[in-house]
Amino acid sequence: MKHLQEILETTHKLILAGIGNVLKHDDAVGVYMTDNVMPTSIIHPLTVELSIENYIGKINQLNPDTLILVDCVHFNRKPGYTNLIPIKQLIDHTTHTHNISLNKLNQFFRMPVYVLGIQPQDVSFGEGMTPAVKTCADHLLSLINTCSYARTIAGH
């Protein structure tokens, strides 16, 4: 997650948007992360669940340097595999778990948009993430919170 760390160390204002359905096991990972990330002057968590299109105006009004959408993404890898990729690459190379057209969504934002994708194990109906995905999310939260807190203490 070197690329994520570089973004966290250089951006001045980042929105972390959590996408997902909390009633479909690992699909809740984006919501879990934005519910548990530490808000700072740099990191602004936004839980959008299944309706990111309803937050386009708010995100643009907040005018972040960078937008990271956190969601489960089918990379055809082992559960918990993580990749941070520009949204345009995601469209070309992976299958997204929702019906949102990411290509169309990208056109509404003025800032660079990335997807922090986490490979799910189970997106069937039910609550609670699988251990592999929760462990991955907790590791990412630790990285994000540590970098953000260190920069906030240092005054950016």
Predicted regions and their residues:
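N-terminal catalytic or cofactor-binding beta/alpha core of small enzyme domains
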Residues: M1-Q121, E127-H156
